[in-house]
Amino acid sequence: MSDVVQKSAKAGGVLAATCISTLVVNANTSAVSILLPAISEDTGTSVGTLQWAVTGYSLVGAAVIVTSGSLGDVFGRKRVFQLGLLLFVVSCVLIALAQSGGLVIAGRMIQGAAGATILACGLSLLSVANDGDAQLRAVSLWGAAAAVGAAAGPLLGGVLVDVTGWQGLFWIDAGVALLCMVLTFVTVKESSDPDRPPTIDYAGTVLIALTLTPLILGVTKSADWGWFSVGTLGCFAVSIAAGYAFIAVEGRVAVPLLDLALLRNRVLVGSTIAILIGAGTINGLMYLLSLYFQDPAALDFSPLEAGLATLPATVGLVVIAPLVPKLAAKLGGRQTIGVGFALTTLGFVVVGLVDASWTYAAFLLPLVAIAVGMGMSNGPASSAATASVSENDVGGASGVSNMARYVGAAVATALAATVYGSVITNQTDDGASASDALASGLAAASWLMAVFSFLGVLMAFVIARHRAAKGTWNDAAAAAAAHTHTLPTSATAGRSGPEQG
């Protein structure tokens, strides 16, 4: 076999292993909210407690997403990628065998580390295995796999709950991850970055977790403890102290988790906040609707019906994704971001008007509006994050925005769950019917998401004009994947700062 054929076969193996594993990770992540009522029924753990299966995943992912990429650069990308796959298999088996909510949550937190490692190192492996146009095609396919996985997850989860029980998703994912491990072992060549200093910012990783964990704990327990209780304020104090310590550490380490100098870039800061808001609101929405649609006092959907109910939103994302780069190139990146968040805000405002008489048909248009708005804002925001910095800083900017996605998902889901549960409890205590209390909880949480989305509109004014992506197939894939990962676009290479356009 010639060297060219061997190289092509190896590159194909890398592409298959990384794309399949990414699709599985994202499908698993987006499916879990649909599974929560079934897990709650089997384990006897309240849905409110099980929200940690969602927020815990994102919390750990936020701490690990950048570090795992650094570990791959230093110790070998193939080695760390396979470690991520192994952890993913272990977490799936642990969750599938779990008899308690605590084990499910623990498994999901392990899965957060595994998923972040697979995403970070998988993209690095693709970049190393290909160059030029082949690299663009490979990254485009990876982005498409990420988007398809995230979109298909809720429907897949709903189907499997009805057919195999909620455990089926995790057994299937474990099997696919094992196959990816074998494929990686056979086809992927080890690589590392010999020019990178062999130091890892472990302190920064720990401090990110110490910043987020008490923050989310304080938010989720505030309804029981009180917002101004010693416990809640203590959690917030620990979070603030850890945040300050993180900033101090990042200013001193040789290779920081977060390059603080990047925070002087207005476009990067604005786009990162926009990315955080977008990821937070879409994850908060999926959590809320998964519970509301399946509650017997609300729409009483089966898991399959709840999964099918997300299809219009998925279709909205799929339809808008190829159009976003061209739209951004024509209107301008920040204008597209602003219009997208305005549409999302409008959708949440409509959902905020929900009452117990609503059928699914009443949710249809606002859900599509939210999804299309997300698709319009996330792609250009991701493009702006990397196009606003020099070529040498693209990796750092991408790391910042990807960390922001996990942070947004963790914090917004915790806030949405807290508001939803608190309002339901208060309404029930005041004598409201279960259906009215549920509708009031969803309305209150939706208004909160609307406020966050409106902040995204304001971020569009913070972001300076920048050169938008030109509308290549790679840009379309990047836009489609933007609610899960920041990918390079045609506006990224060789950038040195914001530009008119």
Feature locations, PLM:
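Intrinsic disorder in cytosolic terminal tails and internal cytosolic loops
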Residues: 1-10, 194, 463-501
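Flexible interhelical linker loops that connect adjacent transmembrane helices
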Residues: 3-12, 133, 181-209, 251-269, ...
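Transmembrane-helix bundle of Major Facilitator Superfamily
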Residues: 1-186, 323-324, 339, 345, ...
